[in-house]
Amino acid sequence: MVERARADRKRIVLPEGEDDRVLRAAGRVLRRGIADLVILGDESDIRSRAAELSVDLTAAVVLNPANSDMRDEFAAQYLEMRRAKGMTIERAQEIMADVSYFGTMLVHNGIVGGMVSGATHTTAHTVRPAFEIIRTQPDVSTVSSVFLMCLSDRVLAYGDCAIVPDPTADQLADIAISSARTAAKFGIDPRVAMLSYSTGDSGTGAGVDKVRAATDLVRRRDPNLLVDGPIQYDAAVDPTVAGAKMPGSPVAGRATVLIFPDLNTGNNTYKAVQRSAGAIAIGPVLQGLNKPVNDLSRGALIEDIVNTVAITAIQAQGN
């Protein structure tokens, strides 16, 4: 992944220049040649703190939205985007002092290839500007996310663990197809497991019925995609359990893309695997936006941030 990012190096914006993890991660990104960086915040404070941390940010550009020459232009653009919503130029200028909005406008204008945020900001604070400014791809109705879970013996894609709280069957099908495409982009051969508390026909209930309906929708929309469900996690990833619970399945026991039925399940599962099994969790990688914006967990480790920058840089290569 790092080699792919280096091969066609892109510029990524990090809006949270006040966070030590972000500064340390920025130093690693620059040292390893993963991406060029723009860091947002007060330049004097950021460079002073970097020196205290023994982090070399010489190669980074530091911009302060509060006094940037681009603020007025970004405010004028945002006013046009949101005029129908009652936006005023005064309010637009105020909004453009916000690092999340300013960073998103850098992406929108092609000044940077993508944005990584969320170490100190909520998911909503990171994602809302992207919805308003960058917007969704024409053929996508559901913006969702995946985590790339790097275990000791494999890499799995988990979706959706960050965006859609309680997806409908239709949204769940969108998430599955988008997640399979994202997985393939990063070298994972997609075999999609639609997770539930029931495997096959062993259980009933509204939750199982939703997953079953979503599985049928995926098969109709993308007939060439290997998908199965409803299926429990153990049957999805363990060949022995799969042989007992779902023999003959092209996915069971070999799943690489695991689709959770709701955000409660997905978010807690990725964190449990990350913290208890020592997996590296890269993401959430957002799917469906016109340009890449990726959200960090507020508990993100330094290497999580580095990896997410690499992911974002690779996504930017596609643009």
Q: What is each residue range found by the language model?
A:
Residues 1-252, 257-319:
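Anion-binding alpha/beta catalytic cores of soluble intermediary-metabolism enzymes, centered on
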